[in-house]
Amino acid sequence: MALRMWASSTANALRLSSATRPHFSPLSRCFSSVLDGLKYANSHEWVKHEGSVATIGITDHAQDHLGEVVFVDLPEAGGSVTKATGFGAVESVKATSDVNSPISGEIVEVNSKLSETPGLINSSPYEDGWMIKVKPSNPSELDSLMGAKEYTKFCEEEDAAH
């Protein structure tokens, strides 16, 4: 795993934890966007649940604080993830941060494009920059995640505290 270096208290606080092209309009924020229709973890991962599959990635807010992403460490398909535990890492020019899963389940697909083009997380965090797709083992875990308005408020409060 990549060498851990924490460049700022904000990056240190990020615990990062995947979706196919959501077609929602973003809520306006001063430097990042939050999409309506997704669920968000306080560790700055998003989840899009469609049918039996949930896609997971890191939020625009998280990638904005990390800066240019230069490397992504992801697990293999067929493995499993547990809610609130790490499944990979994102290395940027500023820091390396763990990526946590907001839900538990079996990994059914990994975004292999990220190994060649990790910057997709910066340019398209909610579309091309998704990380993993999971078959949730406990779909009720989604109920504990935040909606867009809640997550926007959470980010504003977190940023104000730093």
Swiss-Prot record:
Cellular compartments annotated: Mitochondrion
Cofactor(s) required, per the database record: (R)-lipoate
InterPro entries: 2-oxoA_DH_lipoyl-BS, Biotin_lipoyl, GCV_H, GCV_H/Fam206, GCV_H_sub, Single_hybrid_motif
Keywords: Lipoyl, Mitochondrion, Transit peptide
Cofactor binding, per record: Binds 1 lipoyl cofactor covalently.
Domain Lipoyl-binding residues, every copy: 53-135
Residues modified to N6-lipoyllysine: K94
GO cellular component labels: glycine cleavage complex; mitochondrion
Residues annotated as transit peptide in the record: 1-31
GO biological process: glycine decarboxylation via glycine cleavage system
Keyword Mitochondrion annotated: yes
Main location class: mitochondrion
Subunit-level organization: The glycine cleavage system is composed of four proteins: P, T, L and H.
Similarity section: Belongs to the GcvH family.
Task performed by this protein: The glycine cleavage system catalyzes the degradation of glycine. The H protein shuttles the methylamine group of glycine from the P protein to the T protein.
Protein's recorded name: Glycine cleavage system H protein, mitochondrial
Organism: Flaveria anomala
Phylogenetic lineage: Eukaryota, Viridiplantae, Streptophyta, Embryophyta, Tracheophyta
Designated gene of the protein: GDCSH
